[in-house]
């Protein structure tokens, strides 16, 4: 049984996203004083007095405008309305009733879900009720005076909202949840890929051929197999010189935050355009954050192929995106659905490697093999580097400490060699691994090694 959905609807710039953030207790939706910032449907969980529900923010409704996105926004609002158990119709209490409010009210009138009018931006208690009363004229019942930005009046609104929602609550399911962020340049097909992963009749992200359609980092919960996935679609990351101050700049910040939130990051590349600096920068941020990663080559259906094409692309990806050369590569088409299911498999495998713990005995066997193939470097004065033993100290990502006689002897080249040998012996595809080199006198190292013998 799904949680009841509450749709937030209204014309542009009346404070719908601010109300969403207030009800959900966070700041997930981008809030900016400019009409049309929200375009997709953005779902967030909310709770009031123990009653749980989902709130969905929608794009601003305008019925006479030539902007290319408006038919798509209206389609998204229609879908939100169709699945909603109740509607919060948000108006600007300071501005009073506008022609746009009347159009939205007429559009809502006679529809199935109960409608609550939210007269927003009423920060002054002495005038809030009188200003809100004007909205009785819309013929949709009692208006609730609130200030979404300060929170005043939201308690009464939530009491009224919960009263009209279904009384039965679904039992909480304890499926394990993975947070998966979908990142990439604008227009590489991230939203189309999200919609393909979600499936179903009504996609949650708006898909358009205009770059930069998605501005928020949008959370969508999907159950697949024995696991729940929190899929986070993000705004495409452009070069800094192409991003103005405003909602798109905020979207880039949210995308970077989404990487940090994720257990696994899906980096989407357009097969028809190849690798750009933005992908390299994203790969560096993923590796720096220590997140598991899956590389998805989208629009694979648009490529002319022969027997060697896939291997060529895979090699190029790993060469160009060397920060995440350990990531698996999935070739897919969000448009046709080709190999979309394999993305879930790759995400699961990467998450498993990210959480993996290796016994001390197996770890040190791999270490000894690496040392046999290539001895540690020596200093110019002839001091030989020594690696005494290794132990794992963390997961997410797997982190290993190597105890050595002198950390200065182990330069970047040899450290990369050891990582390559460990990966060759132990795997860890899809996950970064981290090595910490610690200096220790030989006698003390041998004594400690005996204490930590095979686990």
From Swiss-Prot:
Gene3D superfamilies the UniProt entry points to: 3.30.300.20, P-loop containing nucleotide triphosphate hydrolases
SMART domains from the UniProt entry: AAA
InterPro entries with a match to the protein in the record: AAA+_ATPase, G_ENGA, GTP-bd, GTPase_Der, KH_dom-like, KH_dom-like_a/b, P-loop_NTPase, Small_GTP-bd
Binding site for GTP 2: 184-191, 233-237, 298-301
Domain EngA-type G: 4-169, 178-355
Binding annotation for GTP 1: 10-17, 57-61, 120-123
SUPFAM superfamilies linked: P-loop containing nucleoside triphosphate hydrolases
Keyword Nuclease listed: no
TM helices/strands, residue ranges: none
Summary of the function given for this chain in its UniProt record: GTPase that plays an essential role in the late steps of ribosome biogenesis.
PANTHER family: GTPASE DER
Entry's family note: Belongs to the TRAFAC class TrmE-Era-EngA-EngB-Septin-like GTPase superfamily. EngA (Der) GTPase family.
Protein name: GTPase Der
Organism: Gloeobacter violaceus (strain ATCC 29082 / PCC 7421)
Lineage of producing organism: Bacteria, Bacillati, Cyanobacteriota, Cyanophyceae, Gloeobacterales
């Amino acid at each position: 049984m799904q949680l009841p959905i509450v749709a937030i609807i209204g014309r542009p710039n009346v404070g719908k996203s601010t109300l969403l953030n207030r009800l959900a207790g966070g700041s997930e939706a981008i809030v900016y004083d400019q009409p049309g910032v929200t375009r997709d449907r953005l779902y967030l969980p909310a709770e009031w007095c123990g009653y749980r529900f989902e709130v969905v923010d929608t794009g601003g409704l305008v019925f006479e405008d030539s902007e290319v996105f408006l038919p798509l926004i209206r389609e998204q609002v229609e879908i939100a309305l169709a699945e909603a158990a109740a509607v919060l119709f948000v108006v600007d209490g300071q501005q009073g009733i506008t022609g746009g409010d009347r159009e939205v009210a007429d559009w809502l009138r006679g529809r199935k879900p109960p409608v609550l009018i939210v007269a927003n931006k009423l920060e002054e208690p002495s005038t809030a009720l009188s200003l809100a009363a004007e909205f009785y004229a819309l013929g949709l019942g009692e208006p609730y005076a609130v200030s979404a930005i300060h929170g005043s009046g939201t308690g009464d609104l939530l009491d009224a909202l919960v009263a009209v929602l279904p009384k039965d609550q679904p039992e909480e399911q304890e499926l394990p949840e993975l947070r998966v962020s979908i990142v990439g340049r604008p227009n590489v097909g991230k939203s189309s890929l999200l919609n393909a992963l979600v499936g179903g009749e009504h996609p949650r992200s708006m898909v358009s051929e205009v770059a930069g359609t998605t501005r928020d980092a949008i959370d969508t919960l999907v159950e697949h197999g024995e696991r729940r996935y929190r899929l986070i679609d993000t705004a495409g990351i452009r070069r800094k010189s192409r991003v103005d101050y405003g909602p798109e700049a905020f979207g880039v910040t949210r995308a970077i935050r989404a990487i940090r939130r994720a257990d696994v990051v899906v980096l989407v590349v357009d097969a028809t355009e190849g690798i750009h600096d933005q992908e390299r920068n994203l790969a560096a941020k993923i590796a720096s954050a220590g997140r598991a990663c899956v590389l998805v080559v989208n629009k694979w259906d648009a490529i002319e192929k022969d027997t060697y094409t896939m291997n060529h692309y895979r090699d190029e990806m790993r060469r160009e995106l060397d920060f995440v050369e350990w990531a698996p590569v999935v070739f897919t088409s969000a448009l046709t659905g080709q190999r979309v299911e394999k993305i879930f498999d790759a995400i699961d495998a990467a998450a498993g490697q990210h959480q993996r713990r290796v016994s001390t005995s197996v770890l040190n066997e791999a270490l000894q093999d690496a040392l046999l193939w290539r001895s540690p470097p020596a200093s110019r004065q002839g001091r030989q580097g020594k690696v005494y033993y290794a132990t794992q100290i963390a997961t997410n990502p797997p982190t290993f400490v190597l105890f050595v006689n002198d950390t200065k002897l182990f330069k970047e080249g040899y450290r990369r060699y050891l990582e390559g040998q460990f990966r060759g012996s132990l795997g860890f595809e899809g996950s970064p691994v981290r090595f910490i080199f610690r200096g220790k006198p030989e006698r003390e190292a041998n004594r400690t090694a005996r204490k930590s013998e095979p686990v």
